[in-house]
Amino acid sequence: EIYNLAAQSHVAVSFEVPEYTANADALGVLRILEAIKFHKLEKYTKFYQAGTSEMYGNVQQIPQTEKTDFYPLSPYGVAKLYGHWITKNYREAYNIFGCNGILFNHESPRRGETFVTKKIIRGLVRIKFGLDKKLFLGNLDAKRDWGHAKDYIEAMWKILQQKKPEDYVIATGKQYSIRVFTNMVCKKLGFDLSWKGKGMNEKGFINSGKRSIIEVDKDYFRPLDVNTLLGNATKARKKLKWKPKYNLNSLIDEMISEEIKLVNES
């Protein structure tokens, strides 16, 4: 079993290094498939390609399924879409057992610190402990379908245990905005957060509106932003007998606990 998780996986960074992103996320997939074909390993291997909900981009349907049209809005999404289609192509042309998992956002305490969930939780924990004063965010109204990486890894494995290679959407089917996610974290940390202002002037306040701890920063907006992602994993639930064990509340609790542990250790 080959699980191709290798990628330049940051959407914002893909605008800065599009060629590198394409080389890793698109051509990297082709190289593995070519190796399977060249060494005549079609009967001995199963290949999993890590797709992404970012391929949907400017969503053409809500919620998104395996049949929803793709419309990526970043070099990352475009490169991943090549990986998706070349996997399908080699599956059909060379009978390679190749599957695409179209995974929506999945998080854990190990999430990279530049990704928004980790950034929010780490930033607010550090503010709680007096280590930082402010958290800077971009689009507060972007909506995502967040799940736990443990659930999604199980789904990846299940995909390659099937008799027939197919593609699957893996998602929770529940959606939250960056703003709501931030509110949830603040509540768990004991902050009485309130929002004031609009657009670039919007700020998050605590202490009955006396202290500003969150600001909107234009540097965290992308040239093109995906406003909404919401997955429909009905196929995975039926064919793989898969469903998520974790919800967003328990995921946030786990990530907060890890950040507090890191602060105490330092």
Feature roles, as predicted:
Residues 111-266:
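C-terminal substrate-binding subdomain of Rossmann-fold SDR/epimerase-dehydratase oxidoreductases
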Residues 1-106, 150, 156, 160, ...:
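N-terminal Rossmann-like NAD(P)+-binding domain of SDR-like oxidoreductases, especially those catalyzing
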